[in-house]
Every structure is written in C-alpha cells, then in structure tokens.
Amino acid sequence: TFGVKLRGSYEWQTGNKLDGSNSKINSYELGLTTTLTFPRVLFPTFSKRDMNFPASTTFRLYADQMNRARFFKLLAFGGDASYEFQPTATSHHSITPFKLTFNLLQHTTHEFDSITNVNKALKKSLQNQFIPAMNYTYTYDDSPITSRRNHLWWQASVTQAGLVLDGIYALAGKKFNQEDKELLGNPFAQFIKGTAEIRYNYALGHKQYLVGRLMAGAIYSYGNARTSPYNEQFYIGGANSIRAFTIRSIGPGRYYQNSDNNKYAYIDRTGDLKFEANLEYRFPILGDLHGATFLDSGNIWLIRNDPDRPGGQLKWGSFLKDLALGTGFGLRYDLTFIVIRFDVGIGLHLPYDTGKKGYYNIPKFKDGMGYHFAIGYPF
C-alpha cells in the first residue's frame, strides 16, 4: 500500500512581544510523508506459515519544514523502516531498527546569529547534523472492546540515537564521549529518549465524558554533544498542552526571560524532561456541537545545569511549585470524519516569580489568556 500524508500548523501570537517591539511572532510547520507498506514482515523472512496476528513492514520518506519567523528555518528530512505487530486486539508493537534524519539549518537572521554567538548550547542544538536512531513503541488501546463503558489508552516509547555509529568509532579507537565524531562530514547526534503517556476516558452519562491524561518524557544526550537536537527536545504549552499559555512559552523550570537576559528571547523554550497532566469534561450542547471545560498542568526541566537559564534544572523539592496551571473552556463541532475545536485557556499559576503574591500569580488577567483553533481533540 502506498500512502501520502500532509500535515501543517500555523501559530500567531498577539502577545509576548520579543523585545518591546511591535512585531509579532508568526511561525509555521509543514510536513510531507510518503509510505510504502507490505502486509507481512520483510527482512528477515519467517517460515512460509503465516503469522496468526496482523504484521506489516513500512518504509517511509519524510520532510518537515519548521519556520521560526525573524530567526531561522529548520529542514529535517530522511527515511526509516519499521515493523508493526498486533498480537491482540488491544496491543500494538512498533519496531524501527533504522531511522536516519538530517537536520539542515536555513535562512538564519542577524538577530538569530547574535543570540547563538553568545549561546553555544542553542547553537549546538540547531547545527546541521545526522540523527541515526532506532525506536521501540508499545501501545495499549482497549477501545475495540465495545462492551466496556470506560476506555484506557497508554503508550511507552524508547529511542536511541548514535549507538551503532559510536560502536564503529569505538572499534577505531575513539573514546565514548569524544565530540568530533562525524557521518559524511557532519556530526551525528547521540542520545537516549523515553516517553510514556496514559489516557483514561470515563463515561459519566449520555455523551458526557471525563477524560484524564498523564504524560512524562526524558532525553539524555552524550558523546558528540551535551545538548540534544532542537527538534528532539521537549516543550510545553499550546493547543494540545497547557492551553492557557503559548506554545514554548513556559520553562524550563522556574527560568524567567527578562530584559536583562535575552539570550533566549526568541520565546522557544525547550528542555530535557517533561511532565504534563490534563483533565477535561466533555458534554453535548446541541446536535453535533459539544462543549468542554478543562484543567491543564505541567512543565519542562533541564537535566544539566545551564547558567544561562537559572532555575531551569529539576529540583524535586520544588516540583509542585514548578508546575504551570491553567483552566478554560472550549467548543467542538463534530463532523464525524473531523472535529473542529476552539479552546480558550485561562492561566492560574506561573512557575516563576511574577512579583504577585499568592498561588494565582498572573500579573494581568489578559496576559493569562490563550486562544486556540485546532483540528481534532487535544488527547
């Protein structure tokens, strides 16, 4: 089976001015993926007897263009081969023994260059580099069991990058943490990354549901760089996260961007660790129009201390205080084949000191408002 998939997103911000100027941040992401799927396992071949459960082999080619207005464009392209197994109606295994991506930084601006000249970690994360990776993902989904009133979905994934190439270099006498290792004249990333997510859909009554979600992730880089590739790091905020706050506007940790420290003043904030919790009550309004109220919480953190981002490292004693919190309400129009969603987020707590006492520390109510138009449910 041959398939083509297009995806895109556009972000515009009416607040969060960068440096007091009147210009806004307008960013977009575009992606194209082509797939070729065979309804059996290839390489290696098994016995002629067919498996007693669905299995497939998929080859992919993909390209993703990320545009951060006023700063840079990042093109990530590559391919992979993966095996899919579904031994039961509720369990799904995905094994990707080969995935190779190349990150190409394009069209940097003078403003961006001035930032990276003094921020080497940021420059390292956005350098041209290969990401040779392998991945395993397990997914459990009991929604096919229609006799169950409530449904559970959870997924765990682990990715390792650079292990095979590092082994080859080790045979050539290179040290494990040596930083000049290359592939085709460009550095390659070395990291291990894990994510876990669980969702529970509890039916309250006629078309009324209470849906909960927990998500956690970690990435640790080593070898060629102590900073992970930019597009592999975690971020928080936006239409599918903490909806009271703009995407990539929270964290890491208690770090606060101010006029005296503008090395990260381009608003993109990323981290090595992530925790997020969401609770949403969904209910019918009229016909295909549905409503929702929600509560979102979470943050990102750094594993290693970064003097340019004080307060960004995870400290267990302040974990709860580090969690940003927002609430809000939304409308969903269900067309069966697609769901059109509009959410309004309301900020309740920021993890850094805003100068306002008490748990509700949003300086101005309007500053804690987020508006999101999206396709599909957030989780």
Regions found by a protein language model. Name each.
Residues 1-155, 243-244, 255, 339, ...:
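Gram-negative/organellar outer-membrane beta-barrel architecture
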Residues 42, 87-89, 204-208, 285-287, ...:
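Short coil turns and loop connectors of transmembrane beta-barrels in diderm outer membranes
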Residues 298, 303, 328, 332, ...:
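Flexible, small/polar- and glycine-enriched "cap/hinge" segments at structural transition points
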